[in-house]
Amino acid sequence: MFADFRTEEPDALARRLETATLPDSVFDLLAQTAARHPDAPAWRFIDDGVERSWGEVLAKVETAAAAFAALGIGPGVHVAVMAWNREEFPIAWLALSRLQAVMVPVNATYTSREVEYVLKTSLAAFLILEAEFLPHLDALETVSLPPSSVIVIGDGALGGHRRWQTLMDEAQGRRAPSTPRSADAVLNLQYTSGTTGFSKACMLTNDYWLCLGCSSTEFFATDLRRFYVGSSFFYMVGQRILLNAMVSGGCAFFPRKPGAKRFMLDVAQLECDYCALFEMVYKQPARPSDAHNALKLATIFAFGPESHADFQRRFDVYGQEFYGMTEIGGGTYMPAHRIAEMTGSASCGVVAPFRDAMIADEDGNPVPTGATGELCVRGRGLLKSYFGNEEATAQAFRKGWFRTGDLARVDSSGYHYILGRTKDMVRRSGENISAREVEVVLRTLDGIQDAAIVPVPDDYRGEEIKAYIQLAPGVDPSTCTPARIADHCGRHLAAFKVPRYYEYRDSFPLTDSQRVQKKHLLAEKPDLRVGAYDWQDKIWR
């Protein structure tokens, strides 16, 4: 297993980065990379067969910026982009940074209703989309974009829309007017995954991306050159990994449609030395070839103690825990040279550069070391606000601190531990129970693929605990019984944390970031006890 990491301590790394001079924009970072590595491979779009050097990428971005400027796209103009992973997507992003305009990434899996919501709430003046998504335009009811404001990638019925390739051909040899660039200019309206209510548009500046890209590249503490982008570019992870490649002068490899089944096959075939690996990949059936890869490091997110160690054995690579969210970018990270000793600790690491963190009580005051509270973050480059939503912005910030909504604790050495969501709790007989804590225990039982904990109203205890169980392929309730599950919980949890109700499911509704959408589970039936096994009364309800 690779372990040749630099040993710079977190405080020293933070001082070095926070006193460094960063570029004025993401485009300027690209220009610097192209100047240093003009002929080095920049990206490869695996399924399209498209490869570019950094010099070629810069030239294409300049052409796109000239084409956009001719349409009237300039500082502050909102441009929605809806596509799978193809090179026009990052070209558009970088060109918009060149013009100080704003990209609104649109999830390619969205329904017409969701597309309309994004276009309406973002006030998008232009839309760039792949031809396959044109039918969404016919379904719009409350949003109307002039055909001349729609740019179509690929072939398809245009109906007055502009064609991407035609615009690029016409702009060859031209340059957009010079635009003063500021790191404080908004570059993205990045929609959250919407775990509660409608998605909110986070106003993310160029500085947000520069702080995230530069610091996360330093977290790796080793020289990486081949970055697998196993995430769609409309998600922030895909954009962040491109910045990692840019900062390091490496190459980013994009599958058109990322997926858990192809993930490790791609990584091995392409000899990638870095990836950000979601737990859905780990949950794929193990292959004898899993460890046959060139990975030096993988970023992971909220792996349980046992799965973290098993992941490292299975894929023969260290998994570096990272805590972040759309609003804050990076919050904490595990120093690479500490991964081995901290594996199995369930810690997400220490505070990231450009960030301060506080564990706060309900009144916003810091709690003692080791006590549980809400993780709050402040620092350079956080979201400016939720676009068009002053109420949500006011609720998210308190005394200058962004409230993550995550319950956490920090130990005496500064290592942080995420315990659950502030609203993802069950209050049973006066005890606050973290749903995530119970879910982690459930997932360690052989035969359980995934689990979700929700509260059930109860006249006597206030709330009872219900466990939704998704069994692994080939396992059925006759072998993984409620009794076996409850016994397992009883051996790993205090009695008041053991679920009372158990219901089996074939699958879970998931958010964009692969989190269970518990609001849908809660809304499925008026009485959540129906269809569940009652462990206390030993009956099916």
Protein language model regions, located:
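AMP-binding/adenylate-forming catalytic core of the ANL superfamily
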Residues: 110-116, 127-129, 267, 275, ...
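ANL superfamily adenylate-forming
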Residues: 7-8, 134-183
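AMP-binding/adenylate-forming catalytic domain of the ANL superfamily
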Residues: 153, 493-515, 535-541
